UniProtKB/Swiss-Prot annotation:
Organism of provenance: Chaetomium globosum (strain ATCC 6205 / CBS 148.51 / DSM 1962 / NBRC 6347 / NRRL 1970)
Biased composition (Low complexity): 1-18
Protein name: Ubiquitin-like protein ATG12
Region forming the signal peptide: none
InterPro entries from the UniProt entry: Atg12, Ubiquitin-like_domsf
Length: 150
C-alpha cells in the first residue's frame, strides 16, 4: 500500500516540478549590469545612442566666457570678461581672480555663481557654464572679500 500511495503522489506532482533555475527565498539577488558581450538581446548600440554617448563628455565650445562682478567692498578688476577653457576646473578661475586682485594666500576670496552658490573647486567650468550661463552665454561669477551669501 505504501508503494501504491507513493506512485499516486508522484503522478499528481508532475505539474509541480521545481523551476529550471532554483530561486533562493529570502535572498534578493543584486541586479548586475550585463556587458555587451554577455547580452543576447542587445548586440550593438543604436546609432542615436552612439552619437549621444560620443558627445556626452564634450563641450559645445572649447572656451567659455566668464564675467566677474564684485560684491560689497570688493575691488573691481579691469577685465571683467575672460575666456576660460571649458575643461578647466573652477580652482583655475579662483587662482586667476586671486592673481588679478593681488590677494595674499592668507586672505580669503569668496566666489559665487549667479549670486547664489559657491561651487566646489573641482567643478568643471564647462559644466557650470552649461547649467548656469545667462542669456548672453556668460557664466556670472560674483566675488567678495568676505562671505556675502548664505
Amino acid at each position: 500500500m505504501g508503494g501504491a500511495a507513493q506512485n499516486n503522489n508522484l503522478s499528481n506532482n508532475n505539474n509541480d516540478s521545481p523551476p529550471a533555475s532554483p530561486v533562493l527565498e529570502g535572498r534578493d539577488s543584486p541586479d548586475l549590469p550585463l556587458t555587451m558581450a554577455a547580452s543576447t538581446i542587445l548586440t550593438a548600440l543604436p546609432r542615436d545612442a552612439t552619437a549621444a554617448l560620443a558627445a556626452a563628455g564634450g563641450f559645445p565650445q572649447e572656451k567659455v566666457v566668464v564675467r566677474f562682478r564684485p560684491v560689497g567692498s570688493a575691488p573691481a578688476i579691469r577685465r571683467d570678461l575672460v575666456k576660460v577653457i571649458s575643461t578647466h576646473k573652477f580652482d583655475s578661475v579662483v587662482a586667476y581672480l586671486r592673481k588679478m586682485l593681488k590677494v595674499p594666500e592668507t586672505d580669503g576670496v569668496f566666489l559665487y555663481i549667479n549670486n547664489t552658490f559657491a561651487p566646489a573647486l573641482d567643478e568643471v567650468v564647462g559644466n557650470l557654464w552649461r547649467c548656469f550661463k545667462d542669456s548672453s552665454d556668460h557664466l556670472i561669477v560674483s566675488y567678495s572679500m568676505s562671505p556675502a551669501f548664505g
